[in-house]
């Protein structure tokens, strides 16, 4: 354990698939790197993770300090100053001694054990924070990607609306449609413009949040990889409940408090001090040696209430551990259910998108041939937009579910995503 602590202290400081591919083709200025790279960078540079690392280093320093021996004490006593001389001889005596206190009854070992367990608890809390942060960062990355996808979808929808407006005007000019159709097409263009502006704003906000979470010096303008289309593998074998970072952290904190009980039980044991020194006499050049033993007497304070308080803290920590175990089990079962549901929703949304795309294609052909009214074409286009947005939402929901499952299993979400 000493080597672990010492080494730690030295640690340095769309249309279809096109929607998912277009963000990669945007400007490379301030682009978010692929998620695995961003995750590793953020774990080292994000302010929240820097704070956790500092807490672990502090706990490691405390554990190393707990191994220190008590310091010796030097005493100087000057006696008979100003006393009358006896037969012309000075009565002065100077005593110089050094006292080394010793911790008996295993007090030092108990203190060291507390330091090591507090260090282990700090490491467990850091791992818990890293796992939670990875899940949150994955969701933020996927949210930014989804917002960019919606922005591209809105831009494409605006282009379709303008094409429909041009077609409507041509039909109106040729006398095949009433001027009302042109006004309806203009209204559709205006709605598409508003939707594009809203989607652009949402994408900017999502990228800004991703930048802030990762500790980036400037806001990102795009993402360079896709989590929405990542085929993350769901572990077949259920992870042991003890692997949950929340359970490990709660258990480590319980163990640290349990070690503190031993410290409190031994606190009343006296520290014995052994003294040795020399005494010089004023009336002669001779010196004498002095030795002594000092110890406190635990007459009034035997730390009974301190022991009781430490025991109750352990009981409270055990109750928290039991609660965390139950919550961790529920969280994992819920995450597994969410992943299964998200997969079904994504499959259904993908089928719906394909059907909506085919319906729009046929409606466009029918409108241009004069067989389909404009209002029906507009309705079909809205259905296509809704279907594609639903696919984006389903992909984002799957990322959320996979991130929650990784957190429940104690894994860094999408650490090895491809």
UniProtKB/Swiss-Prot annotation:
Induction: By nickel. Transmembrane segments: none annotated. InterPro entries: OMF, OMP_efflux. GO terms for molecular function: efflux transmembrane transporter activity. It comes from the Bacteria. It holds the Pfam family OEP. Residues 1-29 form the signal peptide. Keywords: Cobalt, Nickel, Plasmid, Signal, Transport. Belongs to the outer membrane factor (OMF) (TC 1.B.17) family. The products of the genes cnrA, cnrB, and cnrC are likely to form a membrane-bound protein complex catalyzing an energy-dependent efflux of Ni(2+) and Co(2+). The mechanism of action of the CnrCBA complex may be that of a proton/cation antiporter. This is Nickel and cobalt resistance protein CnrC. It comes from Cupriavidus metallidurans (strain ATCC 43123 / DSM 2839 / NBRC 102507 / CH34) (Ralstonia metallidurans). The gene is cnrC.
